[in-house]
Amino acid sequence: MRSFRSLHLLLLAASAITADAVPAGSSITPPPPVEPVSLLSSHSNPQRPWTRLRNWVIESIWGIPKSQTSRPTAHDYSAPLQGSTRYGSDVVLRFRVQGLDEAEALTEATNILFLDVWASTTEFVDIRLAKEVIPSLLGLLPDSLQTAYVPLIDNLPEAISATYPARRSLGLNDQFMPSPSTRAPDLFFEDYQPLSVITPWMQLMASMFSSHARMINVGVSYEGRQIPALRLGRSSQPGESRPMILIVGGNHAREWISTSTVAYIAYNLMTRYGSSAAVTSLLQDYDWVLVPTVNPDGYVYTWDSDRLWRKNRQPTSFRFCPGIDLDRSWSFEWDGNQTQTNPCSENYAGEEPFEGVEAQQLAEWALNETEHNNARFVGFLDFHSYAQQILYPYTYSCSSVPPTLESLEELGLGLAKVIRLTTHEIYDVTSACEGVVIPASGDKSAKSLFPVGGSSGGSGLDWFYHQLRTRYAYQIKLRDRGSYGFLLPSEYIVPTGTEAFNAVLKLGQFLTEQDYPGIRNIDWESEYQVGDETPTQESTAFTDESHEEEGKDVTVDTDDEDDDYYDRWEPLKWEDQRPLGFRRRR
């Protein structure tokens, strides 16, 4: 309690001190730049009183001694001991699936053996299982699949352990002398962070950039934890109806990179306000709400007990199998009672729509914003991992075509292009239903598609697009393509975040050019962050021979003559809803 009071007082002090240090202007012309928090920067000139107090606040919260010149010791969040026991003999295999018969056989076999399907795309299915179960799985598969697999991860406990921050010793040979440009991301985004660090960090950022950021909660989890979010924006007319973009991560607890990525996006939006014309414009024209983890209970559980836990932590009808898949718990086209009724399944959707507490809480918050605060959702980004895909509605069915399909595809291709120009990583763009299916007979051009892992009704993506008529709604599956899966090393946090932040800027550009045509004079190309990676550096993509072949099928053109394609947009109008979707006005 005492430490909580101390933290609270420190944050209040930081908020009061920095209130006069943030830009006060509301015009599109950027006000004086807001300096981001610098945890280890040196000063050649005497510090002003508020600067000294600000640094004291940060030192007190982060535990950085004033005289320390080496990199601070990370928190000791070593891998749980249960990991080596629970996953001692587990491996991850990738199966190449061709045709409906193989897809159905693999789906049935994984259901019979209660296996954990890590990813399923039009090209492959990744499955985690114990080595001693491999013969049983192969015995249930047709001959064509008996040899159609390769190992992705052959030592799962070691891979799990590597994702936790390691305790670092600060010996004389390990000193790190920071440059004056050393900033908070060098520390916070150096490792994955537990919720006990993320929440105070969000509070600190909100207090430091209080002119355009504030901490909110969008709900309460089953175990009673707040679901924290950062709300960013600066309106010249308080209380006016403003378009809103919602960015969420951490629906599935084990997808740590999604949580870090949302935090990275929030950080860059906050710190670049005032110095970036694009970010300043976006925060003055739109409200942004960023939720690093929708599933705080599950996220905490991955740190304390089981790194690969996926669902939330609420009880089910089977006491030994808690948890509901929050991304199958939404009400639109919910089909959990038809597809997956086993509480032990990783995809268990509950016994009724919105049984997943956190999904229900987020939906209530969104509805309250639209009904009582005049909010209009115009963008929704739901970050997941892994597979490097940009998915648009609908998830529940490939036979239902979204009414704004052309616009969704156009912007989706634009997002993929920006990412590729940033770090040279390829993100596929497709319907969310195709993200979990394979074409009939292995023919990618075929129109008849069959699910690998069952229906995916009840997704948040479909709900925001259909129920709230969010114009641009995407589920983005981040890195990688299988080399590490859910266990992406921490050195990829910043490159992945850079990709995602540039994609967010592209979304903002798309919206701005639609909503303010010819008004906002912004050089968007100069605003994108430059990725640290080059084509010659190690890629996170799986590089077996068959995977290299699939890269040839990417349809996003990079020719300069086609650049203007990504900037064109033809508005489509909405009409009354039908039971299964919208009609597009001709």
Curated annotation (Swiss-Prot):
Where would you say this protein principally sits, based on its record? other
Name the domain of life this protein comes from. Eukaryota
Q: Which cofactor does it need?
A: Zn(2+)
Q: Where does Zn(2+) bind?
A: H252, E255, H384
Q: Where in the cell is it found?
A: Vacuole; Secreted
**Cofactor binding notes:** Binds 1 zinc ion per subunit.
According to its UniProt entry, the protein's GO biological process terms are: cell wall organization
Residue stretches making up the Peptidase M14 domain: 191-511
Propeptide residue range(s): 22-167
> What Pfam families does UniProt report for this protein, alphabetically?
Peptidase_M14 (PF00246)
Q: Which UniProt keywords apply?
A: Cell wall biogenesis/degradation, Disulfide bond, Glycoprotein, Metal-binding, Secreted, Signal, Vacuole, Zinc
- Which cysteine-cysteine pairs are annotated as disulfide bonds in the entry? C321-C344
- Glycosylated position list: N337, N368
GO CC list: extracellular space; vacuole
Region called Disordered, residue ranges: 529-564
Q: Which residues form the signal peptide?
A: 1-21
Family annotation (SMART domains): Zn_pept
Its biological purpose is as follows: Inactive carboxypeptidase that may play a role in cell wall organization and biogenesis.
Q: Please report which protein family the annotation says this sequence is part of.
A: Belongs to the peptidase M14 family.
Protein name, as recorded:
Inactive metallocarboxypeptidase ecm14
Q: Which gene encodes it?
A: ecm14
